[in-house]
Amino acid sequence: KDIQVSGHAIECRIYAEDPLNDFAPNPGKITGYRSPGGPGVRLDSGVYMNYTIPTFYDSMISKLVTWGRTRDDSIARMKRALSEYIILGVKTTIPFHKAILRNPNFISGDLNTHFIDQYKNGIESEMVNVIAEDLENVNKMKSTFMPSKKIAAISAAVGSYLNTAKNQQMNKK
């Protein structure tokens, strides 16, 4: 009979577009990719590492949806999901969504159909901050996962140890 509200959902459409350049399409090859997940997170996408965003079609990469019992829960999940979402090689609308989710008027639900135009300057300056933070985080991740001689030596030693132990077990039988 009556429709009952049972939580809140937010959808962010992720496009290969440059939000600081009037959302101009940004086709190209995805050189790094990690999708978000977890409770209350849904991702509808067809892209993957080394996928090429074509110039001839819609530049949509994915639809990222979060659900929570409250608006605040849904916003928190979307912030987390966007922070986990890594797409390298093309510019995306992820910084735009992160900037919107930091806007106090969005958080409080003080919205109207002119929201983006009303807060354009603040959103753009926040996107610049987001992009700088994301770049710093990507550089940290790169240095964390760079192969090192110590790691290679330890990996080789562990592999050798496991093979020796396996062979000794086989010889006992």
Regions picked out by a protein language model, each given a short descriptive name:
Residues 1-173:
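Catalytic cores of soluble metabolic enzymes centered on carboxylation/carboxyl-transfer
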